């Protein structure tokens, strides 16, 4: 499947589309299922981000705004160097642009061919985030970096 299929999938989840979520979570554990269905109670407004900035979607609710970049792979570890360094340049750009607004980019990583919850969310390390966004930032696992 093309990446935009997973982008649409995440948009439907974050928008709280109950029918879609109920179909998706049929094979999930009870805990995963209840967590996914919880979003139907307080969904996000999800906008498709246009242009070459690289952010795919923006999720907004209350005083939270999440610019989200969607990635997918069959591999459990996503390496930003896999695309000739383009993804590395992109994450640096995302960090610079979002830090001016006191927010951070979220990387939604969709694992292909897995049972249960296929989504993993990450934030880049070392961001200076303010307000309520700082709470979320601390909760999300950080992308790991290597020496190269």
Can you annotate each of these PLM segments?
Residues 1-49:
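Acidic-basic catalytic patches of nuclease active cores, encompassing PD-(D/E)XK
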Residues 17, 60, 100-101:
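Alpha-helix C-cap/termination motif
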Residues 45, 49-71:
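Active-site beta-strand-loop-beta-strand hairpin of nuclease catalytic cores
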Residues 70-84:
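Short beta-strand-loop-alpha-helix junction that forms the active-site gateway
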Residues 84-87, 125:
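Glycine-rich, phosphate-binding/catalytic loops in enzymes
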Residues 87-93:
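Short acidic (Asp/Glu) patches
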Residues 95-127:
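Nucleic-acid nuclease catalytic cores
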Residues 116-148:
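Intrinsically disordered, low-complexity terminal regions enriched in charged/polar residues
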């Amino acid at each position: 499947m093309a990446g935009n299929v997973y982008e649409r999938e995440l948009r439907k989840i974050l928008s709280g589309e109950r029918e879609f979520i109920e179909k998706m979570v049929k094979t999930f554990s009870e805990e995963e299922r209840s967590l996914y269905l919880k979003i139907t109670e307080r969904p996000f407004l999800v906008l498709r981000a246009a242009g070459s900035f690289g952010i795919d979607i923006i999720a907004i609710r209350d005083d939270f705004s999440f610019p989200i970049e969607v990635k997918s792979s069959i591999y459990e570890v996503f390496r930003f160097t896999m695309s000739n360094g383009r993804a590395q340049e992109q994450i640096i750009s995302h960090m610079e642009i979002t830090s001016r607004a006191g927010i951070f980019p979220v990387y939604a990583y969709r694992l292909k061919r897995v049972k249960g919850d296929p989504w993993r969310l990450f934030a880049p390390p070392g961001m200076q985030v303010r307000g309520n966004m700082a709470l979320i930032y601390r909760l999300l696992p950080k992308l790991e970096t290597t020496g190269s």
